[in-house]
Amino acid sequence: MRHSRPGRLAIAAITFAVALAASGPTIANTGSPPPVRTPAGAPIVADWLAEHRRYTDWHLTLVDPLYRATSTYAPGDLVPVSRAGIAGRGYVRRFVVADLAALDRAARAAGIRLRVVSAYRSYSSQHSVFQSWVERQGYATAIRYSARAGHSEHQLGTTLDFSFVGGADPWNYADFASTRAGAWLKANAWRYGFVLSYPKGAERLTGYGYEPWHYRYFGRSLAAQQRSSGLVPRYWLWRRN
């Protein structure tokens, strides 16, 4: 894998540059060109195995439209999010709990009751989610707003979708970031190790649509580093890998 990956990255980088030249200006201050897109606007996809596939590589594993986890990737240390005292449902890896609890306490101090809407999702569950998108919206839309099985950060067990107690699911708002909970998370989640994976205006960089509710845990130190880098998490991970 280590011998084949540099070639893939080199090819991808060249292709990105060609696409950038053809597609006009990119998003300012990103430091990286956008992913390649088909004429129809959908991100080009691949099915390459992520290089960092061990459970101890959780902070390095890149899953995106190109790279995926294996179908058997299922961390053995999953625990209910309720262990953190937060409202909602789902499972996360055990080491996420302490900072998730701290995030929830800080939000409560600000008068906000966070709720976890979705957390760990197995390969088979993600397959069902994606197929549902395809059946309802068609493949071209599905590939832009949902991940294929293996390509979802939720399978890592370190990613959560948030809303708030008494509120609707976050995707039912015109912009979840405009709610008190969404705005608070955007400003503060990184302080507790959680990074917004798919920010607004970066769709060409992330390969997915804007999701102001979707946060991946990297730990406080790495989250601060990612924030300081100015890069979207996908490209920050590419550089770290």
Segment roles from a protein language model:
Residues 2-8, 12-119, 123-241:
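Extracytoplasmic cell-surface/polysaccharide-interacting catalytic and binding patches
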